[in-house]
Amino acid sequence: MNRPGNRPSHEQADDYLDKGIALCRRAGFQSILLDGDTDFMQTWKLDAWDRTGYITFVFGADAGKTLVGKAEALPQTAWRRLERPDRYEVRTQERAKPENVKERVVRERGYKNLILQWEDVAEFDHQPHLCQQPYRMVALRKKIAVERGMERLFEEYRYFFYITNDRVGTAEEIVFQSNDRCHQENLIEQLKNGVQAMRNPLDNLHSNWAYMVMSSLAWTLKAWCGLLLPVTPGRWESHHREQRHTILRMEFKRFRNMMLRIPCQIVKTGRRIIYRIMSWNPWTSSLLRLTEAMYYPMRC
């Protein structure tokens, strides 16, 4: 969606979501997930999306008085402690954490500091005003300690809500899935600064739209390289899956340096052409496996 930056992000969001759904269906996708923040919770469309049977949605909901009141009215037994998984796996020896310099400076200068104590999750049914049926509402409760300098002032609860028609996944999975939506912000950043797709170098809307589409093809090709990278069953299966996941999340600058900017000598002999790679990096083997996988035409 290409429009002036002074327009609200959720304007006509339901229309564009419907267009995206139609496009995915034409492409053959059997199930579709809609994931967005509070501004994209189009309550007048939830019933229609739910009736399709193939659309699952997870939207953030504003922590208004009604939802906060329902969450506070839940019995304590309805809440479960949320344990977040580690961001990465330590493969060698775990090292001691370095000093949090920012935390120390905040305390020394007497600034207000918010410290997360723990997180709890619960769920209940909630029917928005414009809906004809209730939906599953997952509540995330964070206990925050408010400090100023070396003194603790008070503790408070902050609530976050997620509305969904997914009745299968656990409340923890719904929260993690919604938090993973933040990767989309990284995608926008890469489209802007990685492949320079949002620079708007021309003087009219249609030309800038065409430039954006053509420039974003570079990022699309990177994504397809990650998706098409073969995974060999057996000893190297987990390593190959990790490589695929890394390429999908890799910044475009790193992808360009690791898999595109490779010095290569081209030798023409008889009836064949030989490509001799003149240097090696940790991703050279992945490039060769990808080349072998793409050598033959893909069949549907």
Regions found by a protein language model. Name each.
Residues 1, 11, 43-49, 68-74:
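Short acidic, glycine/serine/threonine-rich loops at helix termini
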Residues 4, 37-41, 62-64:
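Active-site beta-loop-alpha junctions enriched in small/polar residues
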Residues 26, 46-55:
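Short, surface-exposed basic-aromatic patches at helix termini and helix-loop junctions that form
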Residues 32-41, 57, 162, 184-191, ...:
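Short, conserved catalytic/metal-binding motifs centered on acidic residues
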Residues 58-187, 193, 292, 296-300:
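An anionic, glycine-rich sequence signature occurring as long contiguous blocks
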